[in-house]
């Protein structure tokens, strides 16, 4: 699963920009371990997005522009698309689909 590329593709789709998986893979070629956060950021910049890489916890979720890509446990990428009162987090996970997490 190319979770990082798929997440970037979801962000593009949200903003009305449709790109094939092949195009995304050319912009951000995966290695055996997948794509890096830096690689995703560079590809997003090429696609016209402004990116910021930062560490945040759930208390800062109201300050984040949504949707955004999260680097989950340093080994997986997901898209956070909704936060409800800082207690429920709605995530699009390329491997699991739409998932809701609560505190």
Task: Please report, for each region that a protein language model flagged, where it lies by residue.
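Conserved active-site-adjacent core of cysteine acyl-enzyme catalytic domains
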Residues: 1-103
